[in-house]
Amino acid sequence: MRVQLALNVNDIDEAVEFYSKLFDAKVSKRKPGYANFSIDEPPLKLVLFENPEAGERLNHLGVEVFDDADVHAATGRLRSAGMVSSVEDAKTCCYATQNKVWAVDPQGMRWEWYRVIEDSDTFGPARD
Protein backbone atom coordinates (compact mmCIF):
# COMPACT_ATOMS: atom_id res chain seq x y z
CA MET A 1 0.00 0.00 0.00
CA ARG A 2 1.20 3.53 -0.72
CA VAL A 3 -0.26 7.02 -0.67
CA GLN A 4 -0.99 8.67 -4.00
CA LEU A 5 -0.51 12.38 -4.64
CA ALA A 6 -2.02 13.63 -7.93
CA LEU A 7 -0.93 17.10 -9.03
CA ASN A 8 -2.00 19.46 -11.80
CA VAL A 9 1.11 20.90 -13.47
CA ASN A 10 1.63 23.61 -16.08
CA ASP A 11 4.30 21.80 -18.12
CA ILE A 12 4.59 18.01 -17.98
CA ASP A 13 8.19 17.91 -19.26
CA GLU A 14 9.37 20.45 -16.69
CA ALA A 15 7.52 18.64 -13.89
CA VAL A 16 8.90 15.22 -14.87
CA GLU A 17 12.43 16.62 -14.85
CA PHE A 18 11.92 18.24 -11.43
CA TYR A 19 10.29 15.25 -9.71
CA SER A 20 12.76 12.79 -11.25
CA LYS A 21 15.54 14.73 -9.55
CA LEU A 22 13.62 15.42 -6.34
CA PHE A 23 12.90 11.74 -5.68
CA ASP A 24 15.87 10.33 -7.65
CA ALA A 25 13.32 8.22 -9.51
CA LYS A 26 12.45 7.26 -13.07
CA VAL A 27 9.03 7.74 -14.60
CA SER A 28 6.88 4.59 -14.39
CA LYS A 29 4.37 5.66 -17.05
CA ARG A 30 4.59 8.55 -19.52
CA LYS A 31 1.82 9.55 -21.95
CA PRO A 32 0.82 12.87 -23.54
CA GLY A 33 -0.02 15.28 -20.72
CA TYR A 34 0.41 12.56 -18.09
CA ALA A 35 3.16 10.91 -16.05
CA ASN A 36 3.40 8.85 -12.90
CA PHE A 37 6.16 7.67 -10.60
CA SER A 38 6.08 4.60 -8.34
CA ILE A 39 8.50 5.72 -5.65
CA ASP A 40 9.85 3.18 -3.16
CA GLU A 41 11.22 5.56 -0.52
CA PRO A 42 9.11 7.14 0.72
CA PRO A 43 6.36 4.83 -0.57
CA LEU A 44 4.48 7.21 -2.88
CA LYS A 45 2.57 7.09 -6.16
CA LEU A 46 3.11 10.54 -7.69
CA VAL A 47 0.74 11.35 -10.57
CA LEU A 48 1.14 14.43 -12.78
CA PHE A 49 -1.62 15.84 -15.00
CA GLU A 50 -0.67 18.59 -17.44
CA ASN A 51 -3.48 21.01 -16.67
CA PRO A 52 -2.23 24.63 -16.77
CA GLU A 53 -5.76 26.04 -16.47
CA ALA A 54 -6.43 24.28 -13.15
CA GLY A 55 -7.21 26.63 -10.30
CA GLU A 56 -5.75 24.18 -7.77
CA ARG A 57 -2.41 22.39 -8.00
CA LEU A 58 -3.65 19.43 -5.93
CA ASN A 59 -5.90 17.29 -8.16
CA HIS A 60 -6.80 14.54 -5.67
CA LEU A 61 -5.32 12.12 -3.14
CA GLY A 62 -5.47 8.37 -3.01
CA VAL A 63 -4.29 5.10 -1.59
CA GLU A 64 -2.99 2.53 -4.07
CA VAL A 65 -3.44 -1.09 -2.99
CA PHE A 66 -2.38 -4.24 -4.77
CA ASP A 67 -5.32 -6.57 -4.13
CA ASP A 68 -9.04 -6.23 -4.90
CA ALA A 69 -9.83 -7.48 -1.39
CA ASP A 70 -8.32 -4.24 -0.05
CA VAL A 71 -10.56 -2.15 -2.34
CA HIS A 72 -13.62 -4.16 -1.24
CA ALA A 73 -12.65 -3.79 2.44
CA ALA A 74 -12.21 -0.03 2.03
CA THR A 75 -15.56 0.18 0.22
CA GLY A 76 -17.32 -1.64 3.06
CA ARG A 77 -15.62 0.46 5.74
CA LEU A 78 -16.35 3.75 3.98
CA ARG A 79 -19.92 2.71 3.13
CA SER A 80 -20.56 1.85 6.81
CA ALA A 81 -19.28 5.30 7.73
CA GLY A 82 -21.53 6.96 5.12
CA MET A 83 -18.52 8.28 3.22
CA VAL A 84 -18.71 6.62 -0.23
CA SER A 85 -19.26 9.12 -3.04
CA SER A 86 -18.87 6.55 -5.84
CA VAL A 87 -17.60 3.07 -6.66
CA GLU A 88 -15.97 2.28 -10.01
CA ASP A 89 -15.31 -1.27 -11.18
CA ALA A 90 -12.99 -1.93 -14.14
CA LYS A 91 -13.00 1.77 -15.08
CA THR A 92 -10.32 3.19 -17.36
CA CYS A 93 -8.58 6.24 -15.95
CA CYS A 94 -5.04 7.55 -16.17
CA TYR A 95 -4.00 5.00 -18.81
CA ALA A 96 -5.01 2.09 -16.57
CA THR A 97 -8.09 -0.02 -15.84
CA GLN A 98 -8.85 0.22 -12.12
CA ASN A 99 -11.24 -0.81 -9.37
CA LYS A 100 -11.80 2.03 -6.90
CA VAL A 101 -13.94 3.71 -4.32
CA TRP A 102 -14.14 7.48 -3.86
CA ALA A 103 -14.80 9.58 -0.77
CA VAL A 104 -14.85 13.37 -0.39
CA ASP A 105 -13.59 15.09 2.75
CA PRO A 106 -15.54 17.91 4.47
CA GLN A 107 -13.61 20.55 2.49
CA GLY A 108 -14.26 18.84 -0.85
CA MET A 109 -10.91 17.06 -1.34
CA ARG A 110 -11.39 13.86 -3.34
CA TRP A 111 -9.77 10.64 -2.10
CA GLU A 112 -9.63 7.35 -4.00
CA TRP A 113 -8.80 3.88 -2.70
CA TYR A 114 -7.81 1.91 -5.82
CA ARG A 115 -6.11 -1.05 -7.49
CA VAL A 116 -4.69 -1.03 -11.02
CA ILE A 117 -5.92 -4.10 -12.92
CA GLU A 118 -3.96 -3.48 -16.12
CA ASP A 119 -2.46 -0.72 -18.25
CA SER A 120 -4.53 0.91 -20.99
CA ASP A 121 -3.63 2.74 -24.20
CA THR A 122 -6.26 5.41 -23.49
CA PHE A 123 -6.54 7.95 -20.68
CA GLY A 124 -10.23 7.32 -20.15
CA PRO A 125 -12.95 9.95 -19.62
CA ALA A 126 -12.00 13.62 -19.83
CA ARG A 127 -10.07 15.00 -16.88
CA ASP A 128 -11.71 17.41 -14.46
Whereabouts are the PLM-identified features?
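Short acidic/glycine-enriched loop/turn segments that link adjacent beta-strands
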Residues: 31-34, 55, 94-99
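N-terminal beta-strand motif that seeds the catalytic metal site of vicinal oxygen chelate
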Residues: 1-13, 43, 58-61, 117-128
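Core segments of cupin and vicinal oxygen chelate
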Residues: 2, 6-45
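Vicinal oxygen chelate
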Residues: 12, 62-110
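Short beta->alpha transition motifs characteristic of CBS
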Residues: 49, 95-96, 102, 113-120
